[in-house]
Amino acid sequence: MVKSYNFETLYKICFYNFCLDVKNLLEKIAVKDYPVGMGGCRNNDHGYDCCEYDITVFDGKKQKESTLEYDGIFYQIYHGSLTETSSDILLQYHNMTILYDEQWELRILLSKIKEKKEQIFNSYVKNCLIEAGICISKAKNKLGTDTYASSWIKSGAYFIADAISMINFQRPSPTHMLKFLREFDKSKINEFILVVTESIGIERATPSLLSRMSTSTMGFSDMIEENSHSKIIGQKSHYLKNHSLLSDCYFYLGYVTRNNFIK
């Protein structure tokens, strides 16, 4: 523990392949006395160089996430509540790294999440399957009459992918999710992974198609989210294409589009 003039916290937290300058980050986002934690792929040591830092400030504010760019690095800033009850959100806090928590309030919340891990995971899986059913039902009812029917089908497939990922105790992470799905052990449930990826259409991934998808996904994000998330989308799609991860890029762009389509 290192003391600074504004607060008591670690100057740096080092993970497998990067170090996070906590002191400068907390000053940059001006968190005051609220607990702060980091989740996402960076927290689980499987992030790519293009991945952002997912930072949650537990200030209880009901506002959309924002994007911060600092020294060429992107931070996705979320606002959370210490009294959160939604399994979809609590799941994102599982195994979170505490960056600032003088009153141990966040530590207590994370301890409760750990105790109820199985219940939270099961609730999330159930919610995903319900959402998948709704999407498929909408596609079926509007097939041939609605130009969005195919979008509903793909959205349903992504919800099923979320459920399969969670059944395998892997928190959904769109940039890395296809890789994880491929690596899961064989089982009756995991046999549906092939059906999911075929429904999404990852075999169609080509550099030219991905360039068009990237542009449309960024534009859709700007229209729906209005928080500069499109900059992260552009950086990730560029990285994945340049590293020949075409199917992963297709899956990622489709996942982001699904989220905004549902919104």
Place the predicted regions along the sequence by residue.
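Generic alpha-helix detector with strongest preference for long hydrophobic helices that associate
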Residues: 3-7, 37, 84-87, 106, ...
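Conserved nucleotidyltransferase catalytic core and NTase-mimicking acidic/glycine-rich helix/loop elements
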Residues: 123-263
